[in-house]
Amino acid sequence: MGEVLEFEEYVRTRQDALLRSARRLVPDPVDAQDLLQTALARTYGRWETIEDKRLADAYLRRVMINTRTEWWRARKLEEVPTEQLPESPMDDATEQHADRALLMDVLKVLAPKQRSVVVLRHWEQMSTEETAAALGMSAGTVKSTLHRALARLREELVARDLDARALEREERERCAA
């Protein structure tokens, strides 16, 4: 009975540190909790064989590593061998560069304050409050400025799309003539 209480006390005092160790071993927090629970269950069965309880953390970490390795080996591979390799399209960075160039060009139509808000909120992924603090304005001002800036960007993109379609139509007509 004393061993059970000793193990319970150990788990109670070391649980957070052990969970941090488990989270370093597996990327998903839920899997980390499962890993720790499995390791604790396995360790509980052998608790009395650990003579120096000061080494219990090391023992438990080794159990977690071994358990993770077992899980990794037991996983089902989703790759299925076939006789022919599937055709996979190559990613073309040219389109990405064109999109980025278009976006940089379209941003020029915005006022400097609007451009700053858009860049901080969407590229730097700052929160509304962080953007407000960085620019020295209220959160409400950030929201309204962002709303107006995005509306202006949409208008500009639609206008450019219409211009591009008109140019394509003219080019087709010229080639057909």
From Swiss-Prot:
Induction: By CseB, in response to cell envelope stress.
Keyword hit for Transcription: yes
GO cellular component terms listed in the entry, alphabetical order: cytoplasm
Compartments where located: Cytoplasm
Transcription keyword on record: yes
Family: Belongs to the sigma-70 factor family. ECF subfamily.
Alphabetized PANTHER family for the sequence: ECF RNA POLYMERASE SIGMA FACTOR SIGM (PTHR43133:SF50), RNA POLYMERASE ECF-TYPE SIGMA FACTO (PTHR43133)
Protein name: RNA polymerase sigma-E factor
Taxonomic path: Bacteria, Bacillati, Actinomycetota, Actinomycetes, Kitasatosporales
Name of the encoding gene: sigE
